[in-house]
């Protein structure tokens, strides 16, 4: 099977592991930089072409694995959509990726389906600042920039006054942001659930460094294998399905009123989860694709 891996850097751990796992199983993987792709949008004959080293060629794959960075979401999803209309299978569809990348939209979709998550508020008017703070039960609270990744642009406000100052500062920078309740009892830990299809294939607990509330591994957090409770497994799978994702990293947090979803990641990294659990996650992804391709082209999943 010819498998295209849409990634801007073939040396990244996740990308190289997918290449390795595909080759081990006798497939033909190829890493493709989406920014070097261009589309021929012709009625009844849509194609994706690739220009590298001065040579242009039509790309033909049986399946693609999107590893599209947040900074190139719009163009990357346009390329992926072109593969989709050409009948190429993708483990995650472009519409599902765009749902999950829009933090506000994702929270709205999860809320509509009854998926537990921290109380979240959003407003445009400066007149609503106090209402935002009150709606999440006051400080301490989290202010999260919509475009944040790896914990960047996520700030803890310890007091209502600090929250007001922070919100006004973000407004002054024309930043789009959410205000979210702070789950103190989580103690700076969250759980990354790695979902493939309708199963959680691995999970790790991430713990923040002392004095830090963000548990992201990119910010120096530590990771260890964790045993999930049945309701946590169900929640993670449900969250991925609401987004329409067959491959997802679902971040959940343990609160006094049950597990809550923090975020659904459509392009979860493999290094942390494979290191913590000692599982061949890359191989599980390839195995799932091979099995799912037999079911035919993608059918849109999720709504909204």
From Swiss-Prot:
Its EC number is 6.3.2.-. Mg(2+) 1 binds at residues 251, 263. Keywords: ATP-binding, Ligase, Magnesium, Manganese, Metal-binding, Nucleotide-binding, Protein biosynthesis. PROSITE patterns: ATP_GRASP (PS50975). Mg(2+) 2 binds at residues 263, 265. Mn(2+) 2 binds at residues 263, 265. One of its GO terms (biological process) is protein modification process. Pfam families: RimK, Rimk_N. It comes from the Bacteria. Gene3D superfamilies: 3.40.50.20, ATP-grasp fold, A domain, ATP-grasp fold, B domain. Coiled coil: none annotated. ATP binds at residues 144, 181-182, 190, 214-216. GO terms for cellular component: cytoplasm. Binds 2 magnesium or manganese ions per subunit. The keyword Ligase applies. NCBIfam families: PRK10446.1, rimK_fam. Belongs to the RimK family. This is Probable alpha-L-glutamate ligase 2. It comes from Hahella chejuensis (strain KCTC 2396). The gene is rimK2.
């Amino acid at each position: 099977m010819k498998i295209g891996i849409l990634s801007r850097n073939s040396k990244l751990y996740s990308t190289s592991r997918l290449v390795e796992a595909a080759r081990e199983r006798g497939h033909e993987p190829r890493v493709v930089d989406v920014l070097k792709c261009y589309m021929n949008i012709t009625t009844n004959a849509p194609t994706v072409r690739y220009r590298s080293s001065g040579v242009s060629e039509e790309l033909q794959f049986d399946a693609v694995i999107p590893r599209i960075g947040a900074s190139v979401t719009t163009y990357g999803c346009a390329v992926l959509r072109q593969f989709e209309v050409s009948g190429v299978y993708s483990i995650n569809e472009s519409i599902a990726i765009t749902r999950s990348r829009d933090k506000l939209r994702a929270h709205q979709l999860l809320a509509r389906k009854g998926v537990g998550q921290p109380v979240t508020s959003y407003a445009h008017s400066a007149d609503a600042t106090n209402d935002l703070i009150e709606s999440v039960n006051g400080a301490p609270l989290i202010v999260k920039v919509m475009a944040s990744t790896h914990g960047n642009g996520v700030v803890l406000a310890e007091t209502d006054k600090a929250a007001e100052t922070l919100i006004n500062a973000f407004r002054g920078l024309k930043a789009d942001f959410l205000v979210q309740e702070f789950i103190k009892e989580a103690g700076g830990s969250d759980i990354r659930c790695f979902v493939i299809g309708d199963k959680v294939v691995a999970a790790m607990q991430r713990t923040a460094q002392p004095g830090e509330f963000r548990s992201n591994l990119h910010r120096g957090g530590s990771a260890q294998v964790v045993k999930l409770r049945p309701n946590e497994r169900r929640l993670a799978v449900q969250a991925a399905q609401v987004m329409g994702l067959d491959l997802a990293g679902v971040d959940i947090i343990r609160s006094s009123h049950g597990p809550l979803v923090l975020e659904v990641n459509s392009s979860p990294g493999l290094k942390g989860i494979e290191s913590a659990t000692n599982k061949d996650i890359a191989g599980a992804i390839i195995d799932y694709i091979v099995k799912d391709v037999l079911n035919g082209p993608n059918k849109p999943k999720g709504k909204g």
